[in-house]
Amino acid sequence: MSNQNSKKHLGHTARKRFGQNFLHDMNVIHNIVSAINPKNGQFLLEIGPGLGALTEPVAEQVDKLTVVELDRDLAERLRHHPFLNHKLTIIEQDALRFNFREYFESLELREGEGVRVFGNLPYNISTPLMFHLFKFHDLIQDMHFMLQKEVVKRLCAAPNSKAYGRLTIMAQYYCQVMPVLEVPPTAFKPAPKVDSAVVRLMPHKVLPHPVKDVYWLNRVTTQAFNQRRKTLRNALSTLFSPEQLEALNIDLNARAENLSIADYARLANWLYDNPPAVDNQEEIIDEDI
C-alpha cells in the first residue's frame, strides 16, 4: 500500500498539519460512546469530529450535537451528511482560538447544568487545548478525550512520580481525572506512532485547593518543573527565600515532583499576596507540562 493510500480514509486524505488520525475500530468506538453515555436534552459538543467516527453513533442517541471543526473539507462533508446534517450545529473554527465561554453562555444552561465535551483530539494541540478549556471549567459537566497514552499518564499521575508535572497539577486543580481505556495504533488510519488512551475529566463543583489568581499557580509550577532536577531551594530561589519556603512548610531539599497540589496552591496564594518586585516569567517547556 502506498504511503498516500495509507493516509486516505473514506475518500479523505489525512492532513499532517491538522494532526489527523481517523478512528475506525468499531469496538473502540462503541466503548468510547458507552463511556460518554450521551442523553437527549444534554448539551454535547465534539471537538474535531473528522469523518464522524464518534459523531455518528453519538448523534444516533441525541437530537442535537454541536461540533467544532477547523478542516474546511471535513466541515463541508458533515453539512451534507445524509442523516447528521439536520442534527448538527457546525462551528468552523480553530478550537484553540474559539471563545467557548461566549458560546456556552449563549446556551442558557440551567442551574447545575454543564456542557459535555468530547473528541479525538489532534495530538499536536491536545495539551494547549485542554489548558484553554480549563478556563471554562465552571460551564463544563465533563470531558472525554482521546489522547496520547503518555499524556493520559501525566494527567492521572500522583506526586513523587516521573509522570507528575505541571499538566498534572493544572488538570487536577480543575478536574477529577480518570483513565477510561487504552487504544492501540491499529485503531486509526493512518496509524500513529504512539499508543493512545481515553480520559474522562470532570470539573470540580467546588475547587478543592482554590487559588486567588491562577496566574501564580501557573507561574510557580512552570518555574519548579522547568528545573525539576533541582531542589526547590534552588529552583524557586527567585520567588522565595529559604526562610519563606520553610514558613510555608516546604522541604527545602524536595523537588518539584514531591509537592502536592495543595502545596502549590499555598505557594501561589503567598505569591499573590507577596508578588516579586520583578517577575521574569519563565518560558514553558513542553516536555514538562
Curated annotation (Swiss-Prot):
Major subcellular site: cytoplasm
Transferase is among the record's keywords: yes
Class in the EC hierarchy, top level: transferase
Binding locations of S-adenosyl-L-methionine: N21, L23, G48, E69, D94, N120
Subcellular location: Cytoplasm
SMART domains: rADc
EC number assigned by the record: 2.1.1.182
Reactions mediated catalytically: adenosine(1518)/adenosine(1519) in 16S rRNA + 4 S-adenosyl-L-methionine = N(6)-dimethyladenosine(1518)/N(6)-dimethyladenosine(1519) in 16S rRNA + 4 S-adenosyl-L-homocysteine + 4 H(+)
Designated name of the protein: Ribosomal RNA small subunit methyltransferase A
Protein species of origin: Actinobacillus pleuropneumoniae serotype 5b (strain L20)
